Every structure is written in structure tokens, then in C-alpha cells.
Amino acid sequence: RTWRTCSVEVILASPMVRIRSPSFRPQSRAGQGHIHEKNDDRYILAGYPWFKSRARDTFIALPGLTLSIEEDEYFDLVMKTAEVALREFMEGKPITKHIYEIEQPDVPLWAIWAIQQYAKECGREKCAKKYGALVIDILKYIESDGHPNLKLHDNGLLYAQSSHGEAITWMNSVANGRLVVPRTGYIVEFNALWYNALLFGASLLDEGNAVREHLQAVAANAKQ
């Protein structure tokens, strides 16, 4: 389902919404027809009304809620909003968008994964032109240890550590004020996403490009 407020449109990402429903497409198109105001933001809600727009859930759900029903333009609208929040976080600026948990260390990696799905559906050349700079900027940010909870080790793997004992993965259940499953170190899904992101980022660049070769070398190191 789609909810719209004055200048913000949100898509509900929950079991209630299924891509196979033919009614979703005309609903979304009808909504887009009258919300082309300047600076409109689009969000994906993790659940309504109990959850807000969460960064990790946004990037995981985005391809299925848009690309799989040929709503490529809506993918771009949601990603446009999310990219602002991502760049603000990477630059240490206040977040001006209503996307929560943008600080989770795997969020930038899931963003690249979502963009990779866009490349599969819309073509690598189009993806490189539209999102190539964002992908490379994210990879450079992570490699330079810009994220406070991620560190790239000499073995090419990402090491994750929470700053104050908070949850840094999707396994965030708490009992008696403590994490049920605290996870730190070489978290498997983080590094799977990292390896994938390196090779995908390299594939968006031309043969012989120095950055492409560097990303491939980092990926090869991580693979060992």
C-alpha cells in the first residue's frame, strides 16, 4: 500500500504487501501523478504504524517493491532520498531525511546491493551513469575507515565493533537490557556484502581504470 502526506510519500514494506498483487502498480502510478512537488521525499516503511523508515530495511526491500513490478522510476525516487541521507552520514553532517538507523555499519553495503539489482534490471551502463559515483564513494568511505563501527583489516575483511555495546546487525533482540546475541568481529554477512560490493563497483568502471584494478585487488585479498 502507498500512504501520502503533504510532501512525503511512503511505501509500506510488510507481509501485507505482495509484488504479485496487480493493484499495486496503478496505485503507485496514480500517486506519482500528483506529487511532483519540489523536494518531495519517498520512503519505505518497515511496518505501519509500529515501524518507521529504517535504512537497512529500505535497501533490502527497495528492489522487490519497485524493480520487480517495473517501477524503475520509483526506485530512483526512493534512492534519491536515501542517497541524501547516506551522503550526510558519510560526511558527518546532520541527517535531514526521515530514515532511521542510517548509522548501522551494513547499511552502505545494502545500498550497493540494491543498486546492483537496478543494474540487473535496467542495464549496467545506465546504472553506472546514475549510481556509479555513489557506489565508488561508499567503497572509498569504507576503505578509509570512515565508518565508526567498521575497520578494513590487512586481510581485506571488514571488522565490526559496536561503540557502546549497541546492536550493529539485524540480530538486535534485547533481554534484561542486554543483547541476546552480541555480534562483533568479521561478521559473515558484512563481508559477503563487502566482497560483492567490491566486484560490482569494479564492474561499473572501464577496463584499465586504476580504481577498478584496485577494487579487484582488494576483493582478491578478501577472498583468500
Language model features with spans:
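Acidic, mature catalytic/reactive cores of soluble proteins
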Residues: R1-Q224
